Amino acid sequence: MNSTSTHFVPPRRVGIYEPVHQFGMWGESFKSNISNGTMNTPNHIIIPNNQKLDNNVSEDTSHGTAGTPHMFDQEASTSRHPDKIQRRLAQNREAARKSRLRKKAYVQQLETSRLKLIQLEQELDRARQQGFYVGNGIDTNSLGFSETMNPGIAAFEMEYGHWVEEQNRQICELRTVLHGHINDIELRSLVENAMKHYFELFRMKSSAAKADVFFVMSGMWRTSAERFFLWIGGFRPSDLLKVLLPHFDVLTDQQLLDVCNLKQSCQQAEDALTQGMEKLQHTLADCVAAGQLGEGSYIPQVNSAMDRLEALVSFVNQADHLRHETLQQMYRILTTRQAARGLLALGEYFQRLRALSSSWATRHREPT
């Protein structure tokens, strides 16, 4: 046992040694100890507790593990300072939270800027359609920019843009299912969604009419070809029936009778609303024209006309109510598949009008 210890040389006296040879000596030492039934450790490999750090470094370096003590020191340091670790983790979490908040604010700012840009583009298009140009010396405030833009109308235009996108999606869906195989239950769900989509448009128009009834009446939110067929802020229900009838499958005698009665009722209601509008126009004209020539003050006439304009909002709502009831009655008269074909025909009709408007607008820009 003593002879085994003489093979080891204290590390301080040897700088570099052969690892293979050293491992061989370790193996012989352990074998001899185990064969004698004892496990004596040579005195020179027992490291005193008070040995300096540089001795450990030199010994580990000689065994090819110079970086290990530094790693152990870091682990010991972190284990001795848990509060410091928690503070650093808390700082990192706070920095990440602030970064997310800055990113969210930046995205919101971009979205706000995008909406403002869309609003300005719509206002410019509306100004061009009305024939107002800044170059002609008209004040920019009269063009309806954000300083004087009615927020209710701006919201309506945004909603209507989304409404048209959703309508186009529903038209594509109806076209696909009608050319494929679908049961009546699923088809009924699509038809009801399309009906509700039109009812949502009537609700939007009612809110917009309260904000600016002249805007709704003028149809500035529609394309030029659609405005050509405008009647009290929308389509005539009787014209709707003319568009739909050729696209239905063979109707029964009872269905034909119901459709004819509905068409007659629509025309009577349209005539009544048209006469009421004409009477209102005459009343407004009389109110505005009243007063002495050269009076200079129009306040009494304007106030009198303002009181009568509330009736104009009622006319818009009544016209949309007639459109709503016409769609609802057609839905009751027709089968589910016939109603789906009718809604597809109606949607494609408005798509063609919008396409006609775009073609007409680009025609003027083409070189001659």
From Swiss-Prot:
Summarize tissue expression. Answer: Predominantly expressed in roots.
SUPFAM superfamilies according to UniProt: Leucine zipper domain
Q: Specify the bZIP domain's residue ranges.
A: 82-145
Entry's transmembrane regions: none
Q: Which GO terms describe its cellular component?
A: nucleus
Which cysteines bridge via disulfide bonds? C260-C266
Start-end of Polar residues biased regions: 53-65
Location of region: Basic motif: 84-104
What family classification does the UniProt entry report for this protein?
Belongs to the bZIP family.
- Its name, as the record gives it, is Transcription factor TGA1
The scientific name of the source species is Arabidopsis thaliana
* Originating gene: TGA1
